[in-house]
A protein has these predicted regions:
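Fe-S-dependent hydro-lyases/dehydratases of central metabolism
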Residues: 1-241
């Protein structure tokens, strides 16, 4: 056995690897892992998934674990359905509200003071917690990784699968550690930090990976700043951050 192999075998697991292992239910010959999903967020563009669910005569497996929050086409002012700019966006929200009520999901409706951008509401309301596996039909679901969870975006068919089973088949990404040393200078924001990282590794540098951020500069970030860094992991091509 080579020294390299010994190091690989004895290396402590990263946070991503621990969460993946803790949520693993089964694996298949294609190299995919069946993961249990702790939190599922859906928005008004999730109608395709609900159509698939109902078309297959399936029910939501764990309604309490899914949170429906209209946020993609909601108006910046006004809390009534009539405030929407056109009939199409009104129909999308009505559809989400109807599906949420029909399936007894957690709904943050238009007049709910907790409602906002999904990836802000989850951390702000304590729905997103460390160690969780989290999905949403939105690429920037990685934002929730800032709180120490594994969070990634999924497509409509996967959203339907999560609704029906509270599980998801996924190939295991590789892990990439990015160590940001030192302290930020005055005026350097979290967005500058992540843009600097993307500038170093490239817009596809994180492809096939979950990026795990470390180092003094990261430790000194506020939660809000960490949300920004993890949000933009997608711009580095990563699966999550």
């Amino acid at each position: 056995m080579s020294f390299y192999e010994e190091i690989e075998m004895t290396r402590p697991q990263s946070l991503f690897e621990k969460i993946w292992e803790q949520h693993s239910i089964a694996s298949n010959e294609a190299g995919q892992t069946l993961l249990f999903i702790d939190r599922h967020y859906c928005h008004e563009l999730s109608f395709h998934a609900f159509n698939m669910l109902h078309g297959n005569d399936r029910k939501v497996r764990h309604p309490a674990r899914t949170f429906a929050i209209p946020d993609h086409y909601t108006p910046t002012s006004g809390l009534k359905i009539s405030d929407y700019v056109n009939d199409d966006t009104r129909a999308l929200v009505k559809n989400l509200v109807s599906n949420a009520k029909q399936n007894k999901l957690n709904l943050f409706d238009l007049n709910d003071k907790r409602r906002g951008i999904i990836h802000v509401v989850g951390p702000e309301q304590g729905i997103t917690q460390p160690g969780m596996a989290i999905v949403c039909g939105d690429s920037h679901t990685s934002t929730h990784g800032a709180l120490g969870g594994l969070a990634f975006g999924i497509g409509a068919s996967d959203v339907s699968h999560v609704l029906a089973t509270q599980t998801l088949w996924q190939p295991k990404p590789k892990s990439m550690r990015v160590n940001v040393k030192g302290n930020r200078s005055i005026g350097v924001t979290a967005k500058d930090v992540i843009l600097g990282i993307i500038g170093k590794i490239g817009a596809a540098g994180g492809s096939g990976h979950v990026i795990e951020y470390a180092g003094q500069a990261i430790r000194n970030l506020s939660i809000e700043d960490r949300l920004t860094v993890c949000n933009m992991s997608i711009e580095a091509g990563a699966r999550a951050g």
